Amino acid sequence: MGFYGGGSMASGRPESTGIDSLGIGKILAVYIKDNENLAIDEDKLQLTAELIRVFSASPGRDIVSQVNEDGGGSFSLSLDLQQFKKISDIENFFINLEDNPKGVIPCMNAAVHKVLFDQWETNEFENVMKINVRLHNYPESSISLKNLRAAYIGKLVTVHGTVVKVSTVKPLVTQMAFDCGKCKTGITREFTDGKFSPPLKCDSHGCKSKTFTPIRSSAQTIDFQKIRVQELQKPEDHEEGRVPRTVECELMEDLVDICIPGDVVTVTGIIGVINNYMDIGGGKSKTKNQGFYYLFIEAVSVKNTKRQSAFENSEDSSSSAQTADVGDLYSFSQRDLEFIVKFKEEYGSDTFRRILHSVCPSIYGHEIVKAGITLSLFGGVRKHSMDRNKVPVRGDIHVIIVGDPGLGKSQLLQAAAAISPRGIYVCGNATTRAGLTVAVVKDSMTNDYAFEAGAMVLADGGLCCIDEFDKMTTEHQALLEAMEQQCVSVAKAGLVASLSARTSVIAAANPVGGHYNRAKTVNENLKMSAALLSRFDLVFILLDKPDELLDKQVSEHIMSLHSASGETSPALKKFKPVNAASQNAGYANMHAEGNSLLSRLRLDSEKDDDFSPVPGQLLRKYISYARNFVNPKMSKDAGEIIQKFYLKLRDHNTSADSTPITARQLESLVRLAQARARVDLREEITVQDAMDVVEIMKESLYDKLIDEHGVVDFGRSGGMSQQKEAKRFLSALDKQSELQQKDCFSVSEMYSLADRIGLRVPDIDTFLENLNIAGYLLKKGPKTYQVLSSSYSRSQSSRSR
């Protein structure tokens, strides 16, 4: 069957005089000589002539004028097939392109070649490098990796996925000359698909030699690289126990080095098959598994979503809408945009509460924690990421949830990973350091080392949820760079590189011993370094405190989830909402004024009787749109509120031993305010945004800094608890006793000693009274204490005996 369905058009084939057979044939020979399975026939000449006619017309000339030189004399043309479809009138062209791309694409290359060099008025076709037409934006050929089967061999397909492995760039020999070992006759061989195949016998008359010497200086090479693409799994397509599908892709010439591990790419290419054992000589390995072949993609074009500029995305709205299925993360159909506009118009200022309660609706309460997760999903604005002359400022918001077992931390994390446009969920007790960052693996075929991306790199531009964070103490150090500098540096096996990891981290951890101890700091409860804890913008502590009303509501909510009705918020109908103090006793102190953020975020039993969560797929589109197109700026009034709160924190935090309140906390406040404005799709941060963020930060700090007596101690974000402070104070007192040869000290002397060592206690007088009650100090008179635990005091008491 010809290219035009039966081999002829409605008007019949053109006369040979109508086609410049000689000129077209010479160009076509340049493009199909590499493939010994193709031959120049009348169908190819006719198709090339039709393509020349299309590219010579006015719209076609505009496309051809976009040819780029890629260095080394090679040329490429990026051709949008949706645009080409509008100007092309060639019958059955796209059907044949899908079914026989290896026959159609060389004709397109030759047609562009002819039109371009006719404009340059040159006919030296043999002396110029080839022009490669890179076809993209063809949704009709898109297919998921799990559906790649033998039926697609030789067809044009488009796949979308994450790059997980990239090999080094190597030269691939396409042609080489050989000298006959007997008669010295020169023979030139073309290597199809890069397979080295010397001549079998000499072509000279009378010479039957089978020995040949390759002339390596005559070798013609092209750049060659292999990448491995892993499918992007959507939550709705999740299949239990199925390993994510991967496919090897071969990139050649100008396509090499277009992506790195972690990039999301759209690969358009031709499905091919390869037998790993076909050309391995010697012994039994030659026949081993000879019937088994492996599918791979010979790339025609690769589109990297990270490297696409903004004007490319907005150049043709109709084409970008049609590729919504292929580039699910960064493209929006007309229906998506209509939903975003209607959702914002319908709920207005209530958008934050609606989205917040759509995050894991099966978990009752925890509004402030859900608010922090929601802000982390939207993220702040990243600045100076591409400017090498400035220090990049991260926009990702990191959250850690610490608490007693059984409070729904893991479910919150899984829900966040499912809602995020690009989310990965990992469990700490089954994760290695390399699995989190990047691994260097050895390719069994080439013996080369290559990078294999870990969770933080694969989640670049999205969210990485790490459960059981306390079980992976040895891997904590690997996260320090990724969480602040937004990249992962690796130096292994002679490979030194830095990979992007612009990822928000939401972690969940259980305290040491199974129950959170208020008498200890967060660091001591988690056995986590202060450096890592300070990188989290928000630290939430969930405690399992008995509360009759809250327990009734939670139990009612859980029972309804297992009932036949399946309602998501039935507790609202039977009970009135609890006040701010019911879920956490500490909230009452901070929100005595009544109109707190927590009370505004709660669902009301009367107004929200018909509340239904936003579906995850629509929520993903809304979040993706906000992250890509909304970049809020700080207003003057909002900036003043955030600055005042930060300066107030600095005033309270004066102890030398605690983790200091630094500019990192100020940047956290700015990021949270940007995320709060993004939720409402606003380009300016308002005063209300700043107040909401300050309140969320207060909740986080209040939980982190409160001690076992309910006293807020601004030194408890890190460092030591009061038990360790007491030991430190008594040790210093013992040294002072030995130095001065006395065991009685006045209160003023103890004050000066406490100042000298930077003692972190809320009240020094109460602290001394507690030591007196515990028997470490003995009150000898007004404002005088004897140190009973010092070695000097013990030696004096033994002498008196």
Curated annotation (Swiss-Prot):
Any GO molecular function: ATP hydrolysis activity
Enzyme Commission designation: 3.6.4.12
MCM domain mapped to chain residues: 351-558
Zinc finger (C4-type): 180-207
Family annotation (Pfam families): MCM, MCM_lid, MCM_OB, WHD_MCM8
CDD domains the record matches: MCM8, MCM8_WHD
Binding site for ATP: 403-410
Gene Ontology CC: nucleus
GO biological process, one term: female meiotic nuclear division
Disruption outcome: Reduced fertility and seed numbers due to defects in gametogenesis.
Listed InterPro entries: AAA+_ATPase, MCM, MCM8/REC_WHD, MCM_dom, MCM_lid, MCM_OB, NA-bd_OB-fold, P-loop_NTPase
Keyword annotations from UniProtKB, A to Z: ATP-binding, DNA damage, DNA repair, DNA-binding, Helicase, Hydrolase, Meiosis, Metal-binding, Nucleotide-binding, Nucleus, Zinc, Zinc-finger
Motif position, Arginine finger: 534-537
Catalytic activity, as annotated: ATP + H2O = ADP + phosphate + H(+)
Localization per Swiss-Prot or TrEMBL: Nucleus
PANTHER family hit by this protein: DNA HELICASE MCM8, DNA REPLICATION LICENSING FACTOR MCM FAMILY MEMBER
Role summary: Probable DNA helicase that plays a role in meiotic double-strand break (DSB) repair, but seems not required for recombination with the homologous chromosome. May be involved with RAD51 in a backup pathway that repairs meiotic DSB without giving meiotic crossover, in parallel to the meiotic homologous recombination which relies on DMC1.
UniProt record similarity statement: Belongs to the MCM family.
Protein's UniProt name: Probable DNA helicase MCM8
Source species taxonomy: Eukaryota, Viridiplantae, Streptophyta, Embryophyta, Tracheophyta
The encoding gene: MCM8
